[in-house]
A protein has these predicted regions:
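Amphipathic alpha-helical blocks and their helix-capping loop/short-beta junctions
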Residues: 113-128, 133
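Immediate flanking context of iron-sulfur cluster ligation sites
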Residues: 37-46, 87-98
Length: 168
């Protein structure tokens, strides 16, 4: 098992760095060295339940227990079938992923946006209207999301998500 004092696991089961919040990317190094693990970290959430209270699908069942199959991120990224009808009205405007639990976390209030240009949105996305999203072709999808995690859901998955939001 891996250990690190660089981040802690919090109630919503995301890694959190006390200085950077939970908006960061992970990397790993494969080493052939024996390293001494850092001391275990303490719970910094205290009695806060903002992430649990804010989750519209109740995917965070209780502290440190997340039912991924209820998470908006699962429905919009990983699910390959139809989004279940009971989720109607709970997805707000999330057509890919969801950051509600991160948005309400007090540890993220001072998080800095990345300055990494590779994480900037494709310029064509910045001015898209709802109509543009509904009319998005597979070719345009491939062009604007070729270097993006959004390609994981695929064009058909994104169309499903957009239609589902439009039906709600």
């Amino acid at each position: 098992p891996a250990s690190s004092a660089a981040s802690d696991v919090y109630k919503r089961q995301l890694l959190l760095n006390k200085h950077a919040g939970s908006y960061f990317y992970l990397a790993e190094m494969m080493l052939d060295l024996e390293l001494e693990p850092d001391a275990p970290v303490t719970d910094h959430c205290g009695s806060c339940t903002r992430c649990i209270d804010a989750c519209p699908t109740n995917a965070i069942i209780r502290p440190y227990v997340v039912d991924g199959s209820k998470c908006i991120s699962y429905f919009t990224i990983e699910l390959r079938g139809a989004i279940p009808e009971p989720v109607h009205g709970q997805m707000e405007n999330w057509m890919f992923g969801c950051d509600i639990c991160q948005e309400v976390c007090p540890w993220n209030r001072h998080a800095s946006p990345t300055t990494e240009p590779r994480f900037s949105p494709h310029p064509r996305l910045l001015d898209m209207t709802k109509s543009d999203w509904l009319d998005l072709t597979e070719d345009v999808f491939r062009e604007v999301f070729k270097d993006s995690a959004v390609k994981r859901t695929g064009w058909m998955g994104l169309q499903r998500n957009i239609s589902f939001l439009g039906d709600a």
